[in-house]
């Protein structure tokens, strides 16, 4: 499919898979990634999407890694409710794993129909944090 490249010669083979956002044959699935520099208690938006009455539920799988040796993986369930610009989203974190320290609390904020996934760093967490995530939407 699109974004998949396989190459090689002799005993060496390489497969490259490049993530893409929604659309195509699976519009309910998207990926994202990046990094942010933080201090404790700072909230950073790590993903946004338009919510509408057709999207009832979104599930995120999130991975965070901090330059100070902390890692975190978890799920976040986002339930959408309402219509038009009055949409509301509720979120629940679960399956939280981390070592040795939790990096952030993950939540959502809705403004003018845009749902923002946020990471609020925990006490003692500073520096560059890298994240990757996937989002699966259900209508």
What are the residue ranges of the model-derived segments?
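Glycine-rich, low-complexity segments
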Residues: 12-46, 52-53, 126, 132-139
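Short beta-strand-plus-loop segments that form exposed binding edges in beta-rich domains
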Residues: 119-123
């Amino acid at each position: 499919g699109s974004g998949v490249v396989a190459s090689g010669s002799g005993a060496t083979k390489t497969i490259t898979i490049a993530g893409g956002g929604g659309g195509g044959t699976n519009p309910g699935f998207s990926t994202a990634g990046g990094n942010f520099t933080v201090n404790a208690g700072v909230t950073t938006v790590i993903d946004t999407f338009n919510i509408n009455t057709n999207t009832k539920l979104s599930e995120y799988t999130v991975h965070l890694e901090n330059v100070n040796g902390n890692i975190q993986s978890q799920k976040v369930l986002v339930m959408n409710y309402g219509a038009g610009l009055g949409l509301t989203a509720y979120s629940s974190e679960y399956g939280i794993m981390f070592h040795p320290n939790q990096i952030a609390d993950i939540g959502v904020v809705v403004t003018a129909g845009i749902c923002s996934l946020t990471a609020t760093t925990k006490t003692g967490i500073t520096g560059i944090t890298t994240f990757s995530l996937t989002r699966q939407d259900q209508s």
